[in-house]
């Protein structure tokens, strides 16, 4: 018998991160049974982490993770955990590959043992950004440790799906991402030749929730919006968030890591919102939950 969404048990790894906490909030609002795993004790006091639904666990300890999965027996595990590009230089190379590469492959193995579906979040940074409009079958060619480690972590066996994308969104206690950094500035440069096709964390959460009720069981898929320059994106955020930040155009950085998301849309019939709608929705949602 197919489980209704009200009874599906979801375990989110990296629940305190930019995507993880947004996904946790959104899935809880849709009445899924959600637990999160993170390492940050101070996050546990957040209002939306209630009723012991947040577990404090070091994801480097695979044996403890396996015991947790065995105890909770989730229907889905969604891996939002990872050492991010902005912080990769702070970590030993072995740890980067342990978390970004070994962990998702181990979870893929465990999905067979414990009979859960596994959704892993990858990145457009598996590509060098010289071409743009990358399709799923384009060979990954990143030159840095972050991109290489994420490419090695992409899984696609039975009941394992990798979603390759890029995100912007609000964070809990940090400002590692573009959005939180930008909102604290008075004057910035916006790169007119730096393109990407990411999603807001709220939009990606909506996509993942829809995917939980689709018959898509394996593979690597690009999740992509319409390509936009970093300059255009900052201008849009500036307007919608009613800021008065001075944005100076620059052509100094030239890179195009945009993804082609047509295959995912064809397979699932899930359509990605426009950038304007995504930013408006993100702003409204952040005001609502806070």
Please provide the spans of the model-predicted regions:
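NAD(P)-dependent short-chain dehydrogenase/reductase
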Residues: 143, 155-203, 209-210
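Catalytic helix-loop patch of NAD(P)-dependent Rossmann-fold dehydrogenases
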Residues: 98, 102-103, 125-163, 168-170
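N-terminal Rossmann-fold cofactor-binding loop
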Residues: 36-45, 58-59, 82
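C-terminal amphipathic/interface module of NAD(P)-dependent oxidoreductases
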Residues: 243-248, 252-290
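NAD(P)H-binding glycine-rich loop region in Rossmannoid oxidoreductase-like domains
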Residues: 57-99
């Amino acid at each position: 018998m197919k489980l209704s969404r009200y009874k599906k048990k979801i375990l989110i790894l990296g629940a305190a991160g930019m995507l993880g906490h947004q996904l946790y909030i959104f899935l809880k609002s849709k009445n899924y049974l959600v637990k999160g795993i993170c390492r940050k004790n101070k996050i546990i006091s957040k209002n939306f982490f209630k009723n012991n639904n947040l577990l404090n666990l070091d994801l480097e300890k695979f044996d403890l993770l396996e015991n947790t999965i065995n105890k909770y027996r989730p229907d889905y595990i969604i891996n939002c955990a990872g050492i991010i590009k902005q912080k990769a230089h702070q970590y030993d190379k072995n740890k980067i590959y342990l978390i970004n590469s070994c962990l998702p492959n181990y979870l893929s193995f465990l999905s067979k043992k414990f009979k859960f579906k596994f959704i892993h979040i990858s990145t457009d940074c598996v590509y060098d950004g010289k071409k743009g409009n990358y399709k799923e079958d384009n060979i990954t060619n990143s030159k840095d440790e972050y991109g290489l480690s994420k490419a090695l972590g992409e899984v696609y066996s039975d009941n394992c799906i990798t979603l390759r994308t890029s995100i912007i969104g609000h964070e809990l206690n940090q400002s590692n991402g573009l959005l939180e950094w930008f909102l604290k500035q008075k004057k910035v440069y916006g790169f007119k030749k730096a393109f990407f096709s990411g999603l807001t964390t709220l939009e990606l959460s909506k996509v993942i929730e829809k995917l939980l009720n689709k018959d898509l069981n394996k593979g690597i898929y690009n999740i992509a919006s319409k390509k936009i320059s970093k300059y255009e994106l900052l201008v849009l955020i500036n307007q919608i968030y009613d800021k008065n930040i001075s944005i100076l155009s620059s052509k100094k950085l030239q890179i195009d890591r945009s993804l082609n998301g047509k295959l995912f849309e064809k397979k699932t019939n899930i359509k990605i919102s426009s950038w304007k709608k995504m930013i408006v929705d993100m702003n409204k949602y952040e005001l609502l939950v806070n």
